[in-house]
């Protein structure tokens, strides 16, 4: 009985904490879009390793993958 109560309390805390989180880094309630992330990235650098970004550019993933568009901006020529 005590274990069930403890699990219930922990789940309730998790629900409350998750509900209080805001949807975006800027503090709004809407979800960030890819365009929002691109606009907020002012510096031109690659977050991923050089070889990873080079592979993404070689395989033309810079145009199709949001992951590489954000993390390989310099190599992909997006800034």
Swiss-Prot record:
Where on the tree of life does the source sit, at the highest rank?
Eukaryota
Protein name stated in the entry: U-actitoxin-Avd9d
The listed locations are: Secreted; Nematocyst
What keywords are assigned to this protein? Disulfide bond, Ion channel impairing toxin, Nematocyst, Neurotoxin, Potassium channel impairing toxin, Secreted, Signal, Toxin, Voltage-gated potassium channel impairing toxin
State the similarity comment: Belongs to the sea anemone type 1 potassium channel toxin family. Type 1b subfamily.
Disulfide bond as a keyword of this entry, yes or no, is: yes
| Leader peptide range in chain numbering | 1-19
GO CC annotation terms, alphabetical: extracellular region; nematocyst
Q: Which cysteines are joined by disulfide bonds?
A: 44-79, 53-72, 62-76
| UniProt keyword Methyltransferase, yes or no | no
- Function, as annotated: Inhibits voltage-gated potassium channels (Kv1/KCNA).
Q: Where is the stretch described as Crucial for binding to potassium channels? A: 67-68
Q: Which residues form the propeptide?
A: 20-37
A molecular function (GO) term: potassium channel regulator activity
Q: What is the lineage of its organism?
A: Eukaryota, Metazoa, Cnidaria, Anthozoa, Hexacorallia
Q: Which PROSITE patterns match?
A: SHKT (PS51670)
Which residues are in the ShKT domain?
A: 44-79
């Amino acid at each position: 009985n005590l274990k069930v109560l403890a699990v219930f309390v922990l789940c309730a805390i998790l629900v409350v904490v998750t509900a209080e989180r805001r949807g975006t880094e800027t503090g709004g309630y809407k979800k960030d879009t890819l365009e929002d992330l691109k606009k907020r990235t002012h510096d031109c650098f690659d977050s991923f390793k050089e070889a990873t970004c080079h592979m993404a550019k070689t395989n033309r993933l810079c145009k199709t993958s949001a992951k590489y568009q954000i993390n390989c901006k310099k190599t992909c020529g997006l800034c």
